[in-house]
């Protein structure tokens, strides 16, 4: 394994991809744990380890499709497992943020995004953003598809649209790949259960929603997403309330209901649903469903049936029912 000292400016390294591989191995050896701890790592080394500025090399290592032009060159240095892929994806995003002029300050469990200098958008490195934006407009849909079953990687990749120079959208929108990104992110929200990934997706939708060049398209996607999520919640609420099967299988229906509420809660808390361009048909039905669930704690628990399940399953049911409430009524 290479030492990070070998990656300092002026030192000879076998190849750019070997250098990226060395950084990944170093990070895994140190065992940072939470990927958020990569923020100070990148912040402190970005000016001294030049490979951290090579976003293209990191992106090429993520694309394992053999049809990728760079595949032959990168094959020997590709991530060996999901842990290396996750580190690479989060490292890439941290480096894009640093290069763009965005600083993340990790304080306890809270992340605050700050802009360098005068903390104004104009202080961002727009030249750097304009450099990587067209590339990711093209490859992000492919990467989303490639890592569709890996939430750890997706939670990093889905942040990239927020970092792109959306002022160039008039040029980028002709790229079918970029135009599909809001739809893909919306589909993730409708199917994923991982909280970190859901929050990252909703933050991206909110960022795209607030930009004049992408807002109209994203608001249409959000409207469709909300209709889909409310319908999903209706179906899963009915499945729970009208459950008539093996009591041991009831927890599965509860978990599905909890997942639907988690998705809705993520959207409601982070996306602007008050926009005039957001109009979903099932808005009234959502209100009725929430009121219905608010008074359904005991009904969801099915106390009269709890003696039919084992101790662990009973505890799991109580836990999930509490989660169902918390997802919509966090103040309680």
Regions found by a protein language model. Name each.
Residues 1-332:
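Extended alpha-solenoid helical-repeat scaffolds
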């Amino acid at each position: 394994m290479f030492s990070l000292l070998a990656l300092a400016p002026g030192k000879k390294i076998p190849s750019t991809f070997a250098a990226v591989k060395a950084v990944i191995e170093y990070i895994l050896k140190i065992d940072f744990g939470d990927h958020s701890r990569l923020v100070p790592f990148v912040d402190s080394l970005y000016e001294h380890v030049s490979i951290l500025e090579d976003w293209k090399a990191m992106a090429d290592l993520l694309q394992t499709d053999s049809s990728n032009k760079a595949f032959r060159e990168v094959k020997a240095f590709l991530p060996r497992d999901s842990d290396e892929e996750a580190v690479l994806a989060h490292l890439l995003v941290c480096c894009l943020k640093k290069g763009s002029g965005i600083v993340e300050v990790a304080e306890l469990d809270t992340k605050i995004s700050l802009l360098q200098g005068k903390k104004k958008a104009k202080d961002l490195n727009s030249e750097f953003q304009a450099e990587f934006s067209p590339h990711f407009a093209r490859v992000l849909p492919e990467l989303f598809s490639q890592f569709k079953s890996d939430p750890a990687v997706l939670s990093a990749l889905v942040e990239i649209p927020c970092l792109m120079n959306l002022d160039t959208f008039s040029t980028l929108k002709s790229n079918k790949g970029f135009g599909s990104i809001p739809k893909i992110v919306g589909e993730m929200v409708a199917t994923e259960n991982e909280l970190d990934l859901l929050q990252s997706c909703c933050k991206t939708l909110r960022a795209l929603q607030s930009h004049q060049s992408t807002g109209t398209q994203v608001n249409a996607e959000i409207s469709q997403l909300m209709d889909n999520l409310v319908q999903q919640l209706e179906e899963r609420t009915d499945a729970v309330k009208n459950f008539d099967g093996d009591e041991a299988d009831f927890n599965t229906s509860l978990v599905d209901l909890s997942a639907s509420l988690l998705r809705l809660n993520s959207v409601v808390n982070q996306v602007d649903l008050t926009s005039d361009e957001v109009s979903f048909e099932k808005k009234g039905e959502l209100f009725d469903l929430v009121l219905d669930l608010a008074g359904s704690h005991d009904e969801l628990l099915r106390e009269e049936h709890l003696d039919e399940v084992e101790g662990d399953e009973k505890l799991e049911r109580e836990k999930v029912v509490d989660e169902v409430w918390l997802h919509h009524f966090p103040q309680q």
